[in-house]
Amino acid sequence: MAEQYIYVMKDLRKIYPPNREVLKGIWLSFFPGAKIGVLGLDGAGRSTLLKIMAGEVTEFGGEAWAAKGAKVGYLAQEPRLDPSKDVLGNVEEGVAETRALLTRFDEINAKFGEPMSEEEMDKVMAEQGRVQDAIDAVNAWEIDRTLEIAMDALRLPPPDADVSRLSGGEKRRVALCRLLLQKPDLLLLDEPTNHLDAESVAWLEHHLQDYPGTVVAITHDRYFLDNVAQWILELDRGRGFPFEGN
């Protein structure tokens, strides 16, 4: 992903029936690694904007697209969890790709105990090197510790808890934990501090300050904005007004 912008909007418009225009010709480009807080009154189109960026809303005017190859992650107001899995099972979805790398590395190592030609050996060693590099790039050897820290910091329910019995706030914390572990290039957060205690908010702020990707967060939390956002995007009467934060 070598594009200048991670997300681009050109003349973005959205109308809800019968004739409520919430976004009126927005032109914006988002830099990789930027931390952006989205402000606006209720009904200003903040959630709609994030849903368009997340691909949840696909009917709109104008153009909007993410950079080629960019991974986009979205925390909705009412996120979806897999009811067939417990808390840990849902959180583990966030590290599925990392787990797959570790599994593949073990499979490759097992091959070295099998008879093979010199050519086959070269291929196996080359793949081992590629997988090793991918593992090192995401610090996969520490995945269990990383997962434990995130679950503890966000005060998640017990790992074996039935997600269908969780409160709305508990479900949001599980979904947020899963999303952060996925490490998307573009992280879209709709009121991420809702249902978090002060210590969890402080951990989240620190995590997002160091987050390598782009963060776009809707929030009413002024302290969160001060501590995380480099830019503010204010939505007012369908228009978007970006300005530099603290």
Label for each model-derived stretch:
Residues 1-246:
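ABC ATP-binding cassette signature C-motif
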